[in-house]
């Protein structure tokens, strides 16, 4: 009986922990129809001002040897009453492509990124990065860090 009570207690605590994980996103709005809410949790860094986060949104499309890009703008919004930022990618245009000939080369599935304004963000591990994007857009990210070495400009 005691083992059963302990097991029930552990199950209750684990479901509470799972609910607490979901509660972190409560103040953020639900995704609109046709959109997904994608969340990035960053690890804590010692000097977070020396880091940036690049949001790399895109689609996996059939592509040839040409350089391809999608167009879009990642817009920052503020959650009313909370002051938290979230980001929205409303429209994705394209793909745009260079026009090289690719004789004899088969097309293959490749991740094609969205390029435009607003994709480089300040690093803040205290809050999640919440991105609303169309359902067919995948959100990836890359961490950038500043070099310790600082160069001096030369007067000319």
Curated annotation (Swiss-Prot):
Assigned keywords, A-Z: Disulfide bond, Periplasm, Protease inhibitor, Serine protease inhibitor, Signal
Subcellular location(s) per record: Periplasm
Short name of one Pfam family: Ecotin
Function of the molecule: General inhibitor of family S1 serine proteases.
Gene3D superfamilies assigned to the protein according to its UniProt record, in alphabetical order: Ecotin, Ecotin, trypsin inhibitor
Signal peptide stretch: 1-19
Subunit: Homodimer.
HAMAP family: Ecotin
Family as reported in the entry's similarity comment: Belongs to the protease inhibitor I11 (ecotin) family.
Entry protein name: Ecotin
Superkingdom, natural source: Bacteria
PANTHER family per the UniProt record, alphabetical: ECOTIN, PTHR35890
One Gene Ontology CC term in the entry: outer membrane-bounded periplasmic space
SUPFAM superfamilies on file: Ecotin, trypsin inhibitor
Keyword Lyase part of the UniProt annotation: no
A GO term for molecular function: serine-type endopeptidase inhibitor activity
Site note Reactive bond, residues: 99-100
Disulfide-linked positions: 65-102
